[in-house]
Amino acid sequence: MSAIFAQEWQLDLNEAQEKAQNENKIIVLVFSGSDWCAPCIKLEKEIWNSEEFRAYAKNNFVMVRADFPRKKEHKLTPEQQQKNNQLAEKYNLQGYFPLVIVMDKNLTILGKTGYKKLTPTGYIEHLNSFIN
């Protein structure tokens, strides 16, 4: 199974917002360099792909990925690349990778973080600390 399908990811923030509003969930927007950014890859492997995080996220978060791969074989469609570029212009001007942004269903930013050497439970608590 490909890592991209291990976690249910939205690729469009507007669709994610609609889902968050309908399901009363928090949005977690992740800027990633999936094939070149070592901390992004660790975050994917250690947190996003963990059973524990996936189970929690399914009920509490709408996960959105804005990926910026560099290898030709991982190249995004021009439309997706444009969407990701627009998200970066709005939410990640400094170009931090990974950048994890926690938002409410109205796209109000509640907090920002990145890779942390935490267990999945610890990372869930870390993300929730922005919400409460």
Which residues does each PLM region occupy?
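Short active-site neighborhood of thiol/selenol oxidoreductases, capturing the structured segment around
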Residues: 23-37
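Solvent-exposed loop/turn segments at secondary-structure junctions
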Residues: 34-37, 47, 68-72, 95, ...
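Thiol-based oxidoreductase modules, predominantly thioredoxin-like and allied folds used
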Residues: 9-10, 53-82
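A short beta-strand-turn-helix
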Residues: 9-27, 57
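Bacterial Sec-dependent N-terminal signal peptides
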Residues: 1-8
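Typically the conserved alpha-helix immediately C-terminal to a functionally engaged Cys/Sec
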Residues: 40-56
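C-type cytochrome heme c attachment motif
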Residues: 35-42, 98-101
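Non-catalytic, surface beta->alpha helical segment in thiol-disulfide oxidoreductase systems
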Residues: 89-90, 94-132
